[in-house]
Amino acid sequence: MFSARLVLVFAVVLCIQLCNASWLDERAMTQEKRCNGKYQKCTSNSQCCDQKDYAKRKLRCLTQCDEGGCMKYKQCMFYAGTQK
């Protein structure tokens, strides 16, 4: 039959594998792709969250401008113009 030492080694190896598996799952969850919400900086539309406002407008990566000029960076905002 199996010796006590062999059973102990098997138990330790199994424990190490289970610990590594749970650590990898936690790491994968933290590296999950995150999206940017309203008014957060972005560089492309794909970085903005896939959410819609009350008028069913999607978040887009846009440069905000007013009479004084435009901002130097883009933000995720709901586009008020026509969308297809």
Swiss-Prot record:
Q: In which tissues is it expressed?
A: In unfertilized eggs and early post-fertilization stages, is expressed uniformly. In gastrulae, the expression becomes spatially-localized and seems to be absent from the oral and aboral poles. In planulae, the expression is clearly observed in the ectoderm in packed gland cells absent from the two body poles, and upon metamorphosis, the expression diminishes. There is two types of gland cells, one large and elongated and another small and round. This toxin is maternally deposited at both protein and RNA levels.
Function, as annotated, reads: Neurotoxin that is probably only defensive. Acts as a voltage-gated potassium channel (Kv) inhibitor. In vivo, induces a rapid increase in swimming speed on zebrafish larvae, as well as death which occurs between 2 and 18 hours later.
Q: State where the protein is found.
A: Secreted; Nematocyst
Q: How is it modified after translation?
A: Contains 4 disulfide bonds.
UniProt superkingdom: Eukaryota
CC per GO annotation = extracellular region; nematocyst
| Propeptide residues according to the Swiss-Prot or TrEMBL record | 22-34
GO MF terms held by the record? potassium channel regulator activity; toxin activity
Q: What is this protein called?
A: Toxin NvePTx1
What does the similarity note say? Belongs to the sea anemone type 5 potassium channel toxin family.
